[in-house]
Amino acid sequence: MIHFRLLLTTALLTLCLSHTKAKIDIVPIPEKMEYGNGHYQFGTSIRIGYTDLSLKPASEYLGNHLTQLLGRKVITVYNNKGNVRLSLDKNLPKDGYRLTIDKTGIDIRGNNYCGVISAIATIRQMSFKTQLPYIHITDAPHFEWRGFMLDCSRHFFSKAEVKELIDLMALYKLNRFHWHLTDDQGWRVEIKRYPLLTSKGSWRKYNDQDRVCLQRAIQEDNPDLLLPASKKRVEGTDTLNGGYYTQSDVREVVAYAKQRGIEIVPEVDMPGHFLSAVSNYPGLSCFDTVGWGKTFSSPICPGKDSALEFCRNVWKELFDLFPYEYVHIGGDEVEKINWKKCPDCQHRIAEKGLKNEEELQSWFIHQMENYFNANGKKMIGWDEITEGGLSKTATVTWWRTWAPNVVKDVTAQGNDVIYCPNAEMYIDYPEQKASVRKIYEYNLLPPGLTPSQKSHVKGVQANLWTEWVPTRNRMLYMYFPRMIALAELSWSRPERMDYVDFSRRLLYQFNILNRMEIPYRIPEIDGFHNVAAFVKQGTLKVTCADPTAIVRYTIDGSFPTVKSPQFANPITVDETTHFILRPFGKNGRAGEIVKADFVKQGYLEPVSIQEDLKSGLKADWYEFSGVTCKHIGKAPFNASYQVDDVRIPTNVKGNIGLIITGYIKVPTDDIYTFALLSDDGSWLKIDGNMVVNQDREQSPHEEVCQQALKAGFHKFEVRYFDHNGGQLRLNVYGQDGERLHPSDIYFCTK
């Protein structure tokens, strides 16, 4: 049960203000912040005065917070007389605020309602019981759009869980909640005209995603990956998983977010990702049989007028639930094979003078956008809506990092864009040691954009897809601390940002999250590789960015518990040893399991080279739709390329199976480090020995392993597969930590 512990945000904070100028480690960092000498202490009664009726909800929001914080009665009044005063000041920057705490109390002035709410967020983060430091803050956001997306289709999150997330967004001045309400795996919002969408479409038998969660819960000793009993129901002999929001639920969540200055943007993904609709209402798809095609699911049929009418009717009900200007149509990852075979689609293409199925998708998107505009709404879509022609009024969420020209092209046309590049902003990807920093230091206004183009960058959001996120705890674990980095990236100006200082302030935020019982991800334990090679002796060293974390370990294959040995000092081994490590919070909450294999090796002997060599590697591309590296060579051969590094060759896309071969030449007898990043699977073999093994479906992940090599040439093979976009990169380092340049080490037969 959610206890709405977020209303108690600072009630539980007991960090001591030991002197009058103690720093308040606010995130996002304010534009200007000046400390005074002294503290303001609340009396026995608290009065919040507001000078504009539009601020009444904000006064009640703050009043509820202070009541929980201080255990005293708080009165809100429509005047400017009170310990706390809320007012509007149109001279402040848009959405900006000015906060002053002095002997008279707390004075909050905002350019608008959202500015006042942002000042309240600052107060929520300040550590106090009954006193606050004298301080003067002036602040305003850098970007208009500061958002998060939650996918409630793959796994369902209750109304209370969504409200908890929204309250956390408000704590960090985020102002756009992108609510992904429908997808193939579940329809999550009541549409009264089409009741089967929720009575059937919101419930499913366990699918592959559910089974992976259950399997990982065991493999990783993690109960947060188990499917919640509250989201199950039994029908006959079947156990179903799911749930949905009534229209009353949606109105309640929208009102809750509005009070906290957050706009909700609903997404009903179409024409693809629509299986939960087309499987329950026959006639929406091209053919009676629906399911999965070569890559994605059966889409809606844009050749049928009745299908378009269905979509309009769905959105008509949603318009009444969401009062804001933007709605999101999705528009990504559409399987067009059915459209090529469908008489209705082909008739539509001919009738409208379209060239192909890409333009048919664009025609469908434009039809829906016209309907949105006629109802006073503006359309947002994933960047695939640019294919086949983009309207002049659509806003694009750019997510495909392998389509880097989208931002430049869209903004050059005069359209707005919202950044959410998957490599950095997809927080369903496992967090690694550089993840927070990559978000924090992401450049939203790159030099290649003109001033006019930069004006069309609305901001940024991070997306949480929930195929493998079944619970509230796992959701919050994936959001934090990355949400905090995104908050500062989107709010603060670059000249105020510094990652070292942010890292210091992040420790203070961990204390807040601990007090609020938010199960954030304990930072990466570091200092070692996935596989560490040694010839005589190896030494395990461990560090953690959270100084309150306790690291425990085992060497017998069991998972560490609170009773396992605590890592205190470096551990030296002279035989192969398999460490399993796990950080624990002060309250005993377990973090993520990490494995470190210390492997005793002899140096691999170099091979004798008989043929003439040239710089580079050979990359063979196979039309591979499988999910294991060992079968790539059995797939149909497409083409061969020469590459100068381990990477995906230009023009290789779709179903990708790569076998990259050649030789690696190392200069000295040494232990070399290989950092292989891939999305999806990959492996690296040297002289036939497996060095890095990521032979699995995965989001972007870097595995770092070592191998002892004698100087000279060694046979080299990288295998890689992916089916939509993908990433592949290999960096090689010597024992001194210096990266070896690809042109110096890679060779292949002439």
Region locations from a protein language model:
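Bacterial Sec-dependent N-terminal signal peptides
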Residues: 1-25
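Flexible, acidic glycine-rich loops studded with aromatic residues
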Residues: 379-384, 389-394, 400-541
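Short, compositionally stereotyped local motifs that mark structural "simplifiers"
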Residues: 493, 497, 501-620, 625-665, ...
